Amino acid sequence: EYIAFSDQDDIWLPEKMLSALKLLKKNDADLYCSNLTKWDTSNGSFSELKKDFPQKEFDYLFEGGSAGCTYVFTKKIAKELQSFLVKLDTSNWKGFSHDWLVYFFARSRNFKVFIDGNSFIHYRLHQENVHGHLNKLSWNTIKEKSSEVLKGYYQNHVMNYIQYLDKDSAEYKIYKSFLGNYFQRNFIIWKYNTQLMRDNRKFMIFAVLNLLKF
């Protein structure tokens, strides 16, 4: 009745699935995701990776719900997602993110998503695990985010996602402006501002970097 993503190098706590299923039922949701506990194998330290900022109206247009390894979803959304994926061409996507894709799919089709403030997974960080390192506000984070913005990571994803939106929707118009010229892109970012990302600090970095991208 339920499907969960799993990364082979992470550790699930015993209550992970039971807690996810309880919260899916309690909140009448179709997709569950959660905070994570970062496990830095270089020094053995643990720290929280917060993802449960309040959901915003358009956050799914520019980010995922959490790391995909926290996702648990119902058979209903799984069947629709399967049909969607069969037709999906990712050959021209740069740094394709299944975390973002599933969240985009769920929210754009009005499935309810619940983001749990608890963590039931030890999310292993290592050299190959790029995204895990990018959630801490640091100089390395800013450098990596700068590279994403300046090299067109977001434009590339938006160009692919826009084709799955209703052309009369506000979401489509946001994407259309984002793909426009410098002034159109930055106008739409500042018009909707923190409605585009859940974490206000993350949004500010995103917005400022777009001002620097000509």
Per-range role (PLM):
Residues 90-91, 108, 122-214:
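C-terminal subregions of glycosyltransferases and related glycan-biosynthesis enzymes
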